[in-house]
Swiss-Prot record:
Residues 4-254 form the Pyruvate carboxyltransferase domain. It catalyses: (S)-4-hydroxy-2-oxopentanoate = acetaldehyde + pyruvate. GO terms for biological process: catabolic process; L-leucine biosynthetic process. Mn(2+) binds at residues 13, 193, 195. Belongs to the 4-hydroxy-2-oxovalerate aldolase family. This is 4-hydroxy-2-oxovalerate aldolase. Substrate binds at residues 12-13, 193, 284. It comes from the Bacteria. The record marks 12 as: Transition state stabilizer. The keyword Manganese applies. It comes from Desulfitobacterium hafniense (strain DSM 10664 / DCB-2).
Amino acid sequence: MKKVKIFDLTLRDGSHAKSHQFTPEQMAVLAEQIDSTGVAAIEFGHGNGLGGSALQYGFAAATDREYMEAVAPVVKNADLSIIILPGVGTRHELHLAKEFGAKYARMCTQITEVDIAEQHIKMAKQLGMIPIAVLPCAGIIPVKDTVRYTQMAESYGAEVIYLLDGGGYQLPEQTYERIAAMKKAVDVPIGFHGHNNLQLAVANSKAAVEAGAEYIDCCLKGFGAGAGNCPTEIFAAVMDRMEIDCGIDLYKTMDIAEQYLRPLMPRAMEVDNDRIMLGYAGCYSSFLLFAQRAGARYGVDPRDIIKEIGRRQCTEGQEDICIDVAYALAQKK
């Protein structure tokens, strides 16, 4: 039977949806429950990764170390994963992750800037971790360029390479085409991370698996940036229907999502106007709350901010540019 590994990102991508205000105690309770569902790995921490707690992205409720101290002891079955935006997270964060037993170190850069991650990838490997390259915004460049940057990531030592659709912009056929091309071009496994701004996260994840992806990112109830991510319980049900083993206890996952996560969610992962715009414009989902706040501050429609961010092809870590965009739009009124 074909197998797929699920990385659960409820406690990391979901942090965006809580303005990074998970407490260490909440993370510990959720991590222990998620650990019992059968996921391959659990990723946790600030939404913008280790080192992300800052004025530009939003201060977290706790430090990286405090989250590590809370989560690491309670996870007994799944592996621990962290994500770093090179330049935001440094060697110090990698050493911290290693100290607490993280197995996977994921490096996320704009796909055209994957060379920025070279040092981080090599250091993670030196520390005995499994380095993963996460490449966003592939849907806005030609497939041949996606392949070229994938090969660069492999040459740096990445042992898994992810295609990340951070805006929920891609259509399933685009996802299939890119994953298939990546799979053919390199010798390491391929993963996919989708967002649900056009309600296509499950469809895109399914297309990725059909094209050969072996790793899929999910969150309980899809809890994540923008309109959320691929919901773990829905994706697990789809995989079961397709007779693909993803290791998930479906009933337990559904029950944990309802009992433990729902009470902590500020809102359901519905698709409203601004979230639709994220997917339509190809704007990274983590920009949503920043665009809404900047729009309110300057009297500008957040959709116009999101559209301009998509046009500029900004990526995660540049969220504070929403203020500049909103100010410029306000001056044109």
